[in-house]
Amino acid sequence: ANFILERHIAGVGCLHKHAVVDTPYGICFADHRQVSLIRGTELSELSLLIRDTYQGLDLEVNRGALALGYHPLINNLVVNYSYDAVVMYAYNFDTQSWAKFTSFNNSGKFQSQFEISDDQELQSFSTRTNKVESLFRSNSNDSASVLLLKTKRYDFGLPEKFKRFTKLH
C-alpha cells in the first residue's frame, strides 16, 4: 500500500499504531499531550475538558498500554492509557463530555487496539487471560459490568425539528 502525506500539523501527532481510530465523526488519535479529532481539515482537541484530572496523558506505550477504541452502540470513544487498565476515559460524542472509569471487568492489563465483536461490543486483548474479552456490556444488566448505560432514541414526529430524548438506566 502506498501512502501519500496529505498534510503536516506541527505539535500534534499519533504516538502509536493503537493510538488512532476511525469514528463516524472523523479520525481520533492521541499523543503524549492530548486526544485529538480531525475532520477533513479541521483539528480539535477532545481532551481539553479533562486536563485538570490527568495533567497530560501518562502513556506507557512500551508496555502496550495506549489504545483508542470507538464503541458504536453508545457512541463513545474509549481511551486506555494505563498498562493495568485500572483507569480509562470515555468521551461521549452525543454530550461532548468525558467520563472516568475504573477497573473495567476487574481484569486489568488490556492491551492492543480495541475490536468490535459480532454483537457490537468493544473488545481488547487481556494479558491476564490471554484472550480477547469485552471491556463492558452496554446492552446487559450484568451487575459486574462497570458501564451500565443503555440508550434508546425516540422519535416524536416533526422531522424538521431536531430533538432527542434519552433514557439512562
Across the structure, where does each feature detected by a protein language model lie?
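Surface-exposed extracellular loop regions of Gram-negative outer-membrane beta-barrel proteins
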Residues: 1-9
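Beta-sheet repeat architectures centered on beta-propellers
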Residues: 11-26, 31-169
